[in-house]
Amino acid sequence: MILIMDEDDGRDSSGIRLRDVTVVRGGRRALDSIRVDFEAGSSTALVGPNGAGKTTLLEVLAGLRQPSTGSLTGAQPSVAFVTQTHSRSWLPLSVGEVLRMARFRPTLLPHRLGPDDHAAVDDAAGRLGVRDLIDAPLDRLSFGQRQRVLVAQALARQADVLLLDEPITGLDLVSQERILGVMEAERDAGRIVVLSTHHLDEARHCDRVLVLDGRLVAAGSPEEVLVPDVLREAYGEKVLGDHAHHDHGHALLLVDDHGHGQH
């Protein structure tokens, strides 16, 4: 599901700054004293085991969850957040209707969308390869097709910040490559792109990687951070050896809390 937030409060729109952000959920610290900046024209991957706070951090960036302590400043005026949840209320809608929702504004009736709105929808549909599905009901699509529609909807909004929660999980390789290519293009267009992932090869497409385990374990380039010693600090022995699994020659296989491979 995509959640769109418009907040122009006059703050600096060049980036987002988190200072000592802590989020307490159910008596435990989902995030603990996170201090990090997200700059315009950058892409950041969040990695870490299940329960590490990746989705919580995305929710904080989206304005959906307030920090228990700490501050978030300099937020961009518009955010598009592609979550892992597909809204059931959208299933009877056509792909075109779902995409056009991204262009709705409080002061604009749906049937009053202008040429720029329709152009944005058409461009997003083409970039995600769903233009030929424009009249198809969402409930007739495969999981992968729906995911591409939701990412296309986020692009159609043309928000300044694009947040994606595990966007390529369960997708075929063609869909994965298409979404990764779009993500890189959005970064190059000057947007802030932040995604959570268990795919280390996906994380390598980003400028920076944050390794989370409630706290910020490490931050840096993929070459600096996606190495066994750093990953073991977050995952423990859930990293299966230095070269236990290769994806395109260099990714490591991570396992979840039940010992199952995440790939």
PLM region descriptions:
Residues 47-49:
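The feature captures the beta-strand-to-loop junction immediately N-terminal to the Walker
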Residues 62:
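Helix-to-loop junction immediately C-terminal to a conserved catalytic motif
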Residues 115-133:
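Conserved ABC ATPase "signature" region
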Residues 137-141:
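Conserved ABC ATPase signature
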Residues 162-166:
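Catalytic Walker B motif of ABC-type/P-loop ATPase nucleotide-binding domains
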Residues 214-224:
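Conserved switch/coupling elements of ABC/ABC-like ATPase nucleotide-binding domains
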Residues 224-263:
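ABC ATPase nucleotide-binding domains
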